[in-house]
Amino acid sequence: MKKEKILVLNFGGQYDQLIVRRVREMGVYAELHECDTNLSEINLDNLAGIILTGGPQSVNDSESPKADSKIFDLGVPVLGICYGHQYINYVNGGTIETPNLAEYGKTDLKVDKESCLFKDIPEESIIWMNHKDRVKDLAEGFRATASTANTDVAAMENTDRSLYSVQFHPEVVHSEYGQKILENFVLGICKAEKTWKMKDFAKEIIAEIKEKYQGEKMICGLSGGVDSSVAATIVSKAIGDNLQCIFVDHGLLRKDEAKSVMETYKGLGLNVKMVDKSKEFLDLLKGESDPETKRKIIGNHFVEVFEEEAKKIGGANYLVQGTIYPDVIESGKDKASVIKSHHNVGGLPEDMDFKGLVEPLRLLFKDEVRALGEEIGVPHDMVWRQPFPGPGLAIRVIGDITEDKLRIVRETDAILREEVKNFGLNEKIWQYFTVWTPIKTVGVKGDARSYDNVVAVRAVTSTDAMTVEAANLPYELMQKLSNRMINEVEGVGRIVYDITSKPPGTIEWE
C-alpha cells in the first residue's frame, strides 16, 4: 500500500493550516480535520501518519477537545504538537500540570540525539514555545527525548507504538530546525512518499471532471482573480464550451481591469460573457456610506444579476466555484454551508437551481493555486494578480461613492501598481492598493493655495492573509509615488502610508 497522506487533526491551534502547508512543502499530501471528527467520515486510504495540533485549552479540563480514540489503533505513527503532546501523554495514563511559570517565545532546546525524531539535529538549538501546561509524569512506555530550562519533557516517544510528541512548535519559522524535525517524522518515521505535485494534480483533476461530468453544462462566475480564473481554466480543459463563464462589471473595478481581464480570458479559450451592470450598482450605492451596507448592496445585487444571466443560458446543472482549502477548513469549523459570502461569486444562494457545486481547487492553498495556474498555462500576470475584494473599490472609498472618488482611486492605484512593478516588488508584496479618504489638507500647487484630499497607500506582506505586516517600501519608491500621484491625479493633495499590521488592523480599510 502506498503511504501518501498525512492526517492533521486540529485541536484549536492557531498554526493548524501552517502544519498542513509544511507537510505539503515536502511533496507529501496533508489534509486537516477537526479533532473530534469520526474516523469513519475520513478517507484513510494510503494514510502514512497523523499529526495532532496545538490548542488553547488544558487537557485536564473536562470540556477540552478530544479525538476519536481509534487514531492510536490505525497502525500509523502519530506526532503530537503542544496540546497534542500533552494529549498523547494524558490519554495514555500520564499526568499534566500547570506550573507557575508559563513558557512563551524562543527557548533553548536540548535533545536526545538517539531519537529518530531528532536525527541530524544539533544537540542544542532554538525552538518556539507557547504553553502554560506541561507533562509532569510520563505515561507508561514513554521516555523523554528533549528538555528546556523550564520543561523537563519538551519531547517524548514510545517507539514500540510509534507515538512521538513535542511541547514546542516545529512548524513555525522561529524553531531553528523545526522543518527538519517534521521531515524526520513525515519522511523518516512515517516513510511517506513524495507524490504531491501540481503537474500530476492537474492531470488527475481534469481527468476526474471529464469522466464524472461528461456532457454536463456548467456555469462559473468570474471575478478576475486568480482562484476563479484557475478553476474555470481547469474545468474548461475538461469539458470545453460546456462551461459558460460570466464576468460582471459592477463599475467598481480597477483602471482598465474589465478590458485586460476579458482579453486574458479569451486568450485562455474560455467561453466568457461580460455583463456591464456598472450603472445599476452605482445607482444602488448612491449616498450610502456604511461599509457593511455597501457590501450587502453589492453582494445582493450581484446575486440578482448572476441569477438573471444564468437563466438566460439555461441547461447548466452545475456551478463552478474557486473555493480554496482555507475556505473549506473555515466552513468545517463553523459548520457553515460550502457557499460563503466571501467567495468570489459574491455568495450565491443555496436555492439556486443546480444539481451541485464543482470546486476543483478545494484541496489547494493560495500558493498551490498559483503553481497550478502556471502549470496549466494561465498567464503569469493573471496568476500573480493582486487579491481584490468582491466589493471592489467600494471599500477603498471611505464613505459614500461618487464617480470622482472612484476616478481618484483608479488613477492612484494604477500609478502604485506601475511603480511597484518598476521596482521589481510586484511578486514580493502580498497586496498593495490606495484608499480615498474624506480628509482634506492645505497645500501649495504652483503659486496658489490648494485644499485637496488625502490618499492612503497600503502595502502588506503575508503568506496567507491571516496575519500581515506593512511592507518596508524603499524610500525612493514612496517619494516617487507621492510626486506622481499629487502631480498627475487631480484632487489629490497629500499621500500617507499605512503601517498598521494585522492584527490589530485588517488589510482593507472597510
Residue ranges of predicted features:
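RNA-binding accessory domains that recognize and position tRNA/RNA substrates
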Residues: 1-52, 56-62, 66-74, 86, ...
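Conserved helicase ATPase motor motifs in RecA-like P-loop NTPase domains
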Residues: 78-84
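Extended catalytic-interface subdomain
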Residues: 321-323
